[in-house]
Amino acid sequence: MRINPTTSDPGVSILENKNLGRIAQIIGPVLDVAFPPGKMPNIYNALVVKGRDTLGEEINVTCEVQQLLGNNRVRAVAMSATEGLKRGMDVVDMGTPLSVPVGGATLGRIFNVLGEPVDNLGPVDTRTTSPIHKSAPAFIQLDTKLSIFETGIKVVDLLAPYRRGGKIGLFGGAGVGKTVLIMELINNIAKAHGGVSVFGGVGERTREGNDLYMEMKESGVINEQNLAESKVALVYGQMNEPPGARMRVGLTALTMAEYFRDVNEQDVLLFIDNIFRFVQAGSEVSALLGRMPSAVGYQPTLSTEMGSLQERITSTKKGSITSIQAVYVPADDLTDPAPATTFAHLDATTVLSRGLAAKGIYPAVDPLDSTSTMLQPRIVGEEHYETAQQVKQTLQRYKELQDIIAILGLDELSEEDRLTVARARKIERFLSQPFFVAEVFTGSPGKYVGLAETIRGFKLILSGELDSLPEQAFYLVGNIDEATAKATNL
């Protein structure tokens, strides 16, 4: 591990024996830098611009080389605002890619894309750093075992189970509960698996990032008294940051997660909220770098950029990175190139439905649209598979009958269909669950439901043993015993 030139002691002069260039052109967040002949920096090298603006304020901007243009010029993308920069300013080639602090020192802290702490809690130990650009693990290092990653959330574990070391997409428009679901998962993983999480906030609202941090402190995921006991490291490149920062902050978070996996040999959860913003930042920069746009104005390198991030998220023989990525779907159009490219990399999809959120069923996970490659009898077992299929069939039949019910009413249905509808409505409500992180809003304590309990509960509903209970008894409860207890009080 090398000393990090971008975050090391600012008192040390970095100009000695360094490759010096000068700014030749500035186009928004993109800089052209001229270097002496034969002294061109490598692609992805970090460049640092230091100087003073017209008001005498100090400027310190880090950039990343993207293209070698010829005529001894390189084109670089700035990781922070370029206000105050002017032509002719000195630029230092650091000789290495951006490097960020990794290891236990990162837990409980908030970082920016450069690995600098932004939480006003003092400096971070930067003796152990790692470059953000790496190749994916070799095939021989990969772990091919298939195992389920239990989340304690009924609808997820039963109908679209997550794979340990897999990639999961959380799909949904604005305001259907993606961020709350992510927070619940961080909470459950910390408590049930004792694992660490890394949260990458890519191009989302700063307010939400702040709320998440405050709620993590309240729920104990971040331990203020002893930061080393915290379960999560946070890396933010929010909406107000330049596209360079939003484009690379996902890699910064991933680099921190890789260290926990490869060196500490831990199981890690990597959250990316939102992967769409990673693509969006790439498309903002792409045109300025002089690339021809492709479909819908996205960058022509869309699938390559996505692949270079996603292929590093995997399980090795040492540990695993399970990644949960919120995917904003522009205008709810799943065929848009950004979500469509993301789909290719995912093992499971959790689709959030506005219709369920409107009914007050939270988490608003759509049981019919959510999918998982893990839902196979040879992986999850015959009992789990059969229960999940029966639940889906019951809900699908209810969906088909809804038009008839809306026009003619329940009375026109056959006895069998009426029973199916009654059970489907119970299942729909039983798929809801009180969350630990939502206790503050709902007042009801959160529930973690193990997979065996979940399967037992749905089997009882499907068998007809609970047909006599009112459907309200199944709403926002944990396991099936709580539903029967609630029914006696109704």
UniProtKB/Swiss-Prot annotation:
EC code: 7.1.2.2
Keyword Cell division found: no
Keywords in alphabetical order: ATP synthesis, ATP-binding, CF(1), Chloroplast, Hydrogen ion transport, Ion transport, Membrane, Nucleotide-binding, Phosphoprotein, Plastid, Thylakoid, Translocase, Transport
Record has Chloroplast as a keyword: yes
Catalytic activity: ATP + H2O + 4 H(+)(in) = ADP + phosphate + 5 H(+)(out)
Pfam families per record: ATP-synt_ab, ATP-synt_ab_N, ATP-synt_VA_C
Residues recorded as bearing Phosphothreonine in the entry: 6
GO molecular function: ATP binding; ATP hydrolysis activity; proton-transporting ATP synthase activity, rotational mechanism
GO biological process, one term: proton motive force-driven mitochondrial ATP synthesis
Recorded topology in the membrane: Peripheral membrane protein
Entry superkingdom: Eukaryota
Membrane-spanning segments: none
GO annotations of cellular component type: chloroplast thylakoid membrane; mitochondrion; proton-transporting ATP synthase complex
EC class (word): translocase
InterPro entries registered for this protein in UniProt: AAA+_ATPase, ATP-synt_VA_C, ATP_synth_F1_bsu, ATPase_a/bsu_AS, ATPase_alpha/beta_chains, ATPase_F1/V1/A1_a/bsu_N, ATPase_F1/V1/A1_a/bsu_N_sf, ATPase_F1/V1/A1_a/bsu_nucl-bd
Compartments, record wording: Plastid, Chloroplast thylakoid membrane
Subunit composition and interactions: F-type ATPases have 2 components, CF(1) - the catalytic core - and CF(0) - the membrane proton channel. CF(1) has five subunits: alpha(3), beta(3), gamma(1), delta(1), epsilon(1). CF(0) has four main subunits: a(1), b(1), b'(1) and c(9-12).
Function statement: Produces ATP from ADP in the presence of a proton gradient across the membrane. The catalytic sites are hosted primarily by the beta subunits.
HAMAP family: ATP_synth_beta_bact (MF_01347)
Family according to the record: Belongs to the ATPase alpha/beta chains family.
Protein name per the record: ATP synthase subunit beta, chloroplastic
Taxonomy of the source species: Eukaryota, Viridiplantae, Streptophyta, Embryophyta, Tracheophyta
